[in-house]
């Protein structure tokens, strides 16, 4: 983590449980990020927090540190049953739930608190086996949590800490009724520590905080600009016919260490994957149609560096903590202005620099004015020479004929740069 992203406030300055301090220091966390420095003084006093901060600013560690400290500092409810977790962390997507669980594991190992994970699409019996042995902190998506609760595999009557992560995304995905269903089965808000974190604290998110929290304190960390000042943004205007060749030419020119390419539909993502895989790139595909086990494997391979490029729909745009993403390509400009911010927020995280390259084609260029109004600035435009675009391209692979991530990255150095002056 870049030192420029940190405050002078140290975790050791707070009266945190010694086991929590030890776990943080083992992971190299000594100084707080701004959102952590704002939230921890409140949660350590037992006050509810609704926090707004740009992605990649340490929200996850803020609520995990608070959760572990609270459980270690407060006894469990009397007569607590084995199917009653003490803390519940809700996330909008299974990928985010898995990531939060991974971030929590070092704290769990240091403190002895048991973790559980519940998400749909895969692993029902495996997840249930862990829950049946009893967990202290349950992390999951609302659908699977409700499923387990209705079958009495879990009971929320002993909950002492609740975290709602990416609350605005919960609304976007239509999960608000599920959230309220789960809250109704917990002790009253006055008997819990409640935390809500979101990229935006819109009216509807504040309304949820008012309903389900106990006089929450609002803390906000506003970036200098919505897109982050460490992200270099660039925009091209290709024709529909030249769009794919421009992307492949830019990949050869930029030669990114780790890139995510976003498109608006799964079919477009599959087409991009086919072109890049045929051209020898180590590329993975992440859409809603990819089986859950394969999704997790692809994310793991991308995180480890076994894949250089991930082609994704917006299912991957929120909550994923993938380190060292150097480039984000918007193959399609998104229809939702907020998705532009969330997409390019995959790069330039935690004080690092990043690059965002967007293609404003004939189909999606109309989305640009609203995006620029939302982010508060114009995206710098670059020109290219159509005659210099790559032409020696193989026929794209079909998804049914190959699996994402197969094949080595092209051997040899990147080709010469082809942009016009």
From Swiss-Prot:
It catalyses: ATP + H2O = ADP + phosphate + H(+). Its EC number is 3.6.4.13. InterPro entries: DEAD/DEAH_box_helicase_dom, DEAD_box_RNA_helicase, Helicase_ATP-bd, Helicase_C-like, P-loop_NTPase, RNA-helicase_DEAD-box_CS, RNA_helicase_ATP-dep_RhlB, RNA_helicase_DEAD_Q_motif. It is an enzyme of class 3 (hydrolase). PANTHER family: ATP-DEPENDENT RNA HELICASE RHLB, ATP-DEPENDENT RNA HELICASE RHLE-RELATED. NCBIfam families: PRK04837.1. This is ATP-dependent RNA helicase RhlB. It comes from Klebsiella pneumoniae (strain 342).
């Amino acid at each position: 983590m870049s030192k420029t992203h940190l405050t002078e406030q140290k975790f050791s300055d707070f009266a945190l449980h010694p086991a929590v301090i030890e776990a943080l220091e083992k992971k190299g966390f000594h100084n707080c990020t701004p959102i952590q420095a704002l939230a921890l003084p409140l949660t350590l006093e037992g006050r509810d927090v609704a926090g707004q901060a740009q992605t990649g600013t340490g929200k996850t560690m803020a609520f995990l540190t608070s959760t572990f400290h609270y459980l270690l500092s407060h006894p469990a409810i009397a007569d607590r049953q084995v199917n009653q977790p003490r803390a519940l962390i809700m996330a909008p997507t299974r990928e985010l739930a898995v990531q939060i669980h991974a971030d929590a594991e070092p704290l769990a190992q240091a403190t002895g608190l048991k973790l559980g994970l519940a998400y749909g699409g895969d692993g029902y019996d495996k997840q249930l086996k862990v829950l049946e042995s009893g967990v202290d902190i349950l992390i999951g998506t609302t659908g699977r949590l409700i499923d387990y609760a209705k079958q009495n595999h879990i009971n929320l009557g002993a909950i002492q800490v609740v975290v709602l992560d990416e609350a605005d995304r919960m609304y976007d995905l239509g999960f608000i009724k599920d959230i309220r269903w789960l809250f109704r089965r917990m002790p009253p808000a006055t008997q819990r520590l409640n935390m809500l974190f979101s990229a935006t604290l819109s009216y509807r998110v504040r309304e949820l905080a008012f309903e389900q929290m106990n006089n929450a304190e609002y803390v906000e960390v506003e970036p200098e600009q919505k897109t982050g000042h460490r992200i270099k943004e660039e925009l091209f205007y290709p024709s529909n016919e030249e769009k794919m060749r421009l992307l492949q030419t830019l990949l050869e020119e930029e030669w990114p260490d780790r890139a995510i390419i976003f498109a608006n539909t799964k079919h477009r993502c599959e087409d991009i994957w086919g072109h890049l895989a045929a051209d020898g790139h180590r590329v993975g595909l992440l859409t809603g149609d990819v089986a859950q086990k394969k999704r997790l494997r692809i994310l793991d391979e991308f995180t480890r560096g076994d894949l250089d490029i991930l082609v994704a729909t917006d299912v991957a745009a929120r909550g994923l903590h993938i380190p060292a993403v150097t480039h984000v390509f918007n193959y399609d400009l998104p229809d939702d202005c907020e998705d532009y911010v969330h997409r390019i927020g995959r790069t330039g995280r935690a004080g690092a620099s990043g690059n965002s390259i967007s293609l404003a084609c004939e189909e999606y260029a109309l989305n640009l004015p609203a995006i620029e109004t939302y982010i508060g600035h114009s995206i710098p435009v670059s020109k290219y020479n159509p005659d210099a675009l790559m032409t020696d391209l193989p026929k794209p692979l079909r998804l049914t004929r190959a699996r994402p991530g197969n094949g080595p990255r092209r051997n040899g150095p990147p080709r010469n740069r082809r942009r016009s002056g």
